[in-house]
Amino acid sequence: MKASQQTVDLQLTRPLRISRATMAAREAVWLDLEHEGLHGYGEAVTSGYYGLDADTLGHLLYADSQWLAGFADPESALDALGDPDRPGAGVPPAVTAAVESALLDLIGKRSGLPVHRLLGSATATSAATARTIGITAPDVAAAEAGRLARHGFTVLKVKAGSPDPADDLDRVRAVRAAAPHVRLLLDPNGAWDFTTAQRLLPLFAGLGVEAVEQPLAPGDPERLAKLAARSPLPLIADEDAVGFEDARRLAGRVQGINVKLAKCGGVGAALRIAELIEGTGTDLMLGCLTASTLGIAPAVHLADRARWIDLDGHLLLAHDPWTGIGGTDGTVRAERKPGLGVRRRTEEPRP
């Protein structure tokens, strides 16, 4: 297999403010694996939170590309990708996820099967995705919520964690009034302490919020589990549930775990977490980083396995360089085409 990569800028339509930062753009590194005239693609995006810049991602993807060159075909490379003793093991999960994406895309094209078929789903997956509304003024949030509801969105996720919690309550009230029939998720991104969370959770429950992601600062999963046992709302671990061992510690102790492929290491790792938590009382959420359609697509092929879907990262972009998973009407869909089913907007379809 031959490999090449390209680094691109992904600009957001408008800056997205969350409790710990405001983001207006991020870089993405695209991996292109070629074998016998077919191409498979993967994407890794930069993350200040996880300490990944474009140079680091490019270096690590290049190292993995050198390793991949030693395999006769993508199928054998995919089998070896999860080997803990392989050269380069221990690289950031985002890199492994991008390599796995490219291999799955390539294997699907070689076999004529879409990725969801490779993963055991007989039918093309589709699901209502949440759409994120950042920390902003209530009237701005209300206008956005009304627009999204009119376009078909049935799930909205409102960011929280303002210095004054009253501002978050006002924002959620405004969103609820503008879109009374949508399901509401809330995400403080770890901004609350235990006492604040205990005070606020009943108030947000009264506003019709369905579930809350990561209310407490990450690093104390025992405290999160303690809060979940007392909460009137389902709590979904995100920053406290990075990989399999984190999920194992929290299974049955929180109501949900937000699995992001860039956080856990890809589709295979996500499936292992889903199997681990099944039947424990902890449900699966599929989330994402802000990324292009290429970066979101692998998770869309898993969308039938989750209770909550938050795969809107590509919808936040001013220009998504890839297409193939929908989402603008509130529903993401896996294509029935071989592989990931995505293609570049600026190019003719490649094999």
Residue ranges of model-derived segments:
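Metal- or metallocofactor-binding catalytic centers and their adjacent structured scaffolds
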Residues: 21, 33-35, 39-110
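Metal-dependent enolase-superfamily TIM-barrel catalytic cores that perform enediolate-based chemistry
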Residues: 117-231
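Conserved, mostly hydrophobic/aromatic
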Residues: 31, 37, 99, 112, ...
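Catalytic alpha/beta core domains of metabolic enzymes, predominantly
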Residues: 219-312
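Predominant activation on well-ordered alpha-helical scaffold segments within soluble catalytic domains
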Residues: 62-65, 96, 100, 104-105, ...
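Flexible C-terminal active-site loop/helix
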Residues: 1-3, 7-12, 23, 36, ...
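Hydrophobic faces of well-ordered beta-strands that scaffold small-molecule active sites
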Residues: 40-42, 127-133, 154-158, 184-188, ...
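Short, P/G- and charge-enriched loop/turn segments at secondary-structure junctions
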Residues: 15-20
